Amino acid sequence: MTPWYLYLIRTADNKLYTGITTDVERRYQQHQSGKGAKALRGKGELTLAFSAPVGDRSLALRAEYRVKQLTKRQKERLVAEGAGFAELLSSLQTPKIKSD
């Protein structure tokens, strides 16, 4: 099974784009060449700010959603220190128990 990664790309105007992929370098090159997400087209120079393995596709999708809900400040802490990423992944892996 191919591992999935969560990544953040910083645009020239200092915004952070969050995505998932199985190959961070390939996906980053797609974004650089304008063949990636429309949200990044025409945004100037792009830099890969953060990437980390997250597991399978399902977990990667949940992690992407969760990171997209973070504030800019929280995303900046994640980029700078990896702050809270292990806890975020742990919370996504913990099975939820339904109560009646």
Curated annotation (Swiss-Prot):
Question: Which InterPro entries does the record match to this protein?
Answer: GIY-YIG_endonuc (IPR000305), GIY-YIG_endonuc_sf (IPR035901), UPF0213_domain (IPR050190), UPF0213_GIY-YIG_endonuc (IPR022992)
> What are the residue boundaries of the GIY-YIG domain, all occurrences included?
2-77
This protein's source sits in the domain of life called Bacteria
Family of this protein? Belongs to the UPF0213 family.
* Record protein name field: UPF0213 protein YhbQ
Which species does the entry assign this protein to? Escherichia coli O8 (strain IAI1)
Lineage, opening ranks: Bacteria, Pseudomonadati, Pseudomonadota, Gammaproteobacteria, Enterobacterales
